[in-house]
Amino acid sequence: MAFLRVFKKQTFWIFGFFVCILIGCTSSNTETKLEDLSAKEIYAKAQKEFDDGDKVKAAELFLDIERLYPYSGLAKRALLMSAVALHHEKDYESSRGSAARFITFYPADADTPYAYYLIALSHYDQIDEIGRDQATTYEALKTFRIIIERYPNSEYAKPSSMKIELAFDHLAAKEMEIGRYYLKNSHYMAAINRFKIVVEEYPTTSHTPEALHRLVEAYLSLGLTNEATISGAILGHNFKSSVWYQDTYDLLGGVDTGLNINNFKGWLGDVYRQVIRGDWI
């Protein structure tokens, strides 16, 4: 009897073991492999992951469509959506890769301007601290310009123009930061060269009034009263309501150069004639 009880117990466990194996195999067989799904089904899964907030999984599934069904009608859209999903996840390098492949494969597509815009944004969104290298800013500017020049009537041309202005402001801020450092440490010519870049290359940015004021400071420190006077005249003409105007006026209050500004030579004379007199030749 004891033997029979042991035998029954062992038989029960063996039976249970095989049942578990059978259930596991059945479960595995019911799981559909990705390769068994159509492009449309994979796209639906990817879109659901995207909508649910799992952009990483969504990007993987979108790229699976490109891998499994490269010639399907959804491959093109999936490739672009992978760039969008990766951008959301701040995986900018991978996002650029997907967008660049889209441009290579579909250069004349209606969504190609958007692919360029994603590339530009991937650079632009990495612009942060003014103390860092500005290579990213220049890459963003280059791609935004491509959009404006090649696709001026696209919906991305106007936001690209706005982003260019903001990028210019960022570059001007970088020049101002370096220029102030040189000015503070009495490296006047080095400071002048930095402020000159702001006035000549980024004249529409918010930093131009201060750049002109700092030029007045630097030129007066070097005893170059003519240059200081012209810098002040440009500031007074264009930015009289600026917070820098009164400080500049006070600096130049006791300066009497007897200068005929209209005949002044050099880069400041050119700027003066262009800005105030409207002579662009």
Where are these regions (language model features)?
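Bacterial N-terminal signal peptides
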Residues: W13-L22
